[in-house]
Amino acid sequence: MKIIGIEEHFVTADIRAAWAASPIGQEGTGGFDRGEIEMRLDDLGEQRLALMDESGVDVQVLSVTTPALHNLEPEESVILARRTNDLVAATIAKYRTRFQGFATLPTAAPKESCCRT
């Protein structure tokens, strides 16, 4: 039987920068120490795979961490959604048997959210 971790969070440097620059100034990982948890959120490669193996997790379903793109301007959220979804797709392609992913939606741009981003 496979062990599958659902909604396994990650974040990108682009998203962190957007959070910091937003008028709300909400950095979603601000409550984390800038140590191991941040490194785990940033990694979509060998370190994550090693932790999965250590924990007996066969597959992770990747999902950008909260607040995702919810508090960003519509135009910026569309650009970041595309970049993030491309990154997830590339990660899945590289590690086909280990990762799946949820789409990141630009919720500030509802019409764009229903289209491929």
Residue locations for each model-derived region?
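Helix-coil boundary/capping segments in enzymes
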Residues: 1-117
